[in-house]
């Protein structure tokens, strides 16, 4: 089970957090299969208030392999339902070797900015991202998927893909004016 102590922080030296992660080949090794399970398990437990408190976990909607110091193109994403009558997640999968094959010109950003399990401090500012994306990735069985995502799930997946490329969310914040976003940016969240 992954705990907060296992998650690499952005101020730690000698980690793979800022490296471009290696592509994953199939079939997955036993270690890679376990990593995929562990990443998703962290998200599931962290989104359960009682269990998160029991294990001292910060809630998350995404966790990438480089965040646990493993340089592999793998991330778990679990965007919970926003429908009180249906608790089916909006998006839930372990995305392996993900590639954004198309993206909207329209940008989107969270009104409260973004956070990250690898960043312990609050960093104010808008993180402009593409509002809609088409994502191509492989699952743990090696099956290829192509999905269209918009708004929050698109932002979450772009955040996780950034981790696979050695990029952190605050790299996207305008350094001179943190609360400036491209004209026409859609805000939500």
UniProtKB/Swiss-Prot annotation:
Residue ranges that the Swiss-Prot or TrEMBL entry lists as coiled coil: none
Record CDD domains: Pep_deformylase
Homology family: Belongs to the polypeptide deformylase family.
Function: Removes the formyl group from the N-terminal Met of newly synthesized proteins. Requires at least a dipeptide for an efficient rate of reaction. N-terminal L-methionine is a prerequisite for activity but the enzyme has broad specificity at other positions.
Active site: 160
Entry's cofactor comment: Binds 1 Fe(2+) ion.
Species of provenance: Limosilactobacillus fermentum (strain NBRC 3956 / LMG 18251) (Lactobacillus fermentum)
NCBIfam families registered for this protein in UniProt: pept_deformyl
Identification of the protein by name: Peptide deformylase
Residues reported to bind Fe cation: 116, 159, 163
SUPFAM superfamilies reported for this sequence: Peptide deformylase
């Amino acid at each position: 089970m992954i705990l907060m102590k296992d998650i690499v922080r952005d101020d730690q030296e000698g980690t793979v957090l800022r490296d471009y992660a290696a592509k994953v080949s199939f079939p997955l090794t036993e270690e890679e299969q376990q990593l995929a399970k562990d990443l998703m398990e962290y998200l599931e437990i962290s989104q359960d208030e009682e269990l998160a408190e029991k294990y001292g976990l910060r809630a998350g909607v995404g966790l990438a392999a480089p965040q646990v110091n493993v340089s592999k193109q793998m991330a778990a994403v679990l965007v919970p339902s926003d429908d009180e009558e249906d608790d089916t997640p909006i998006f839930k999968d372990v995305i392996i070797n993900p590639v954004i094959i198309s993206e909207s010109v329209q940008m989107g950003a969270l009104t409260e900015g973004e956070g990250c399990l690898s960043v312990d401090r609050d960093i104010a500012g808008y993180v402009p991202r593409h509002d809609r994306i088409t994502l191509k990735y492989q699952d743990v069985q090696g099956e290829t998927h192509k999905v269209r995502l918009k708004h929050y799930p698109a932002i979450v997946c772009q955040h996780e893909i950034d981790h696979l490329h050695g990029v952190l969310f605050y790299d996207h914040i305008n350094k001179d004016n943190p609360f400036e976003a491209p004209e026409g940016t859609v805000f939500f969240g």
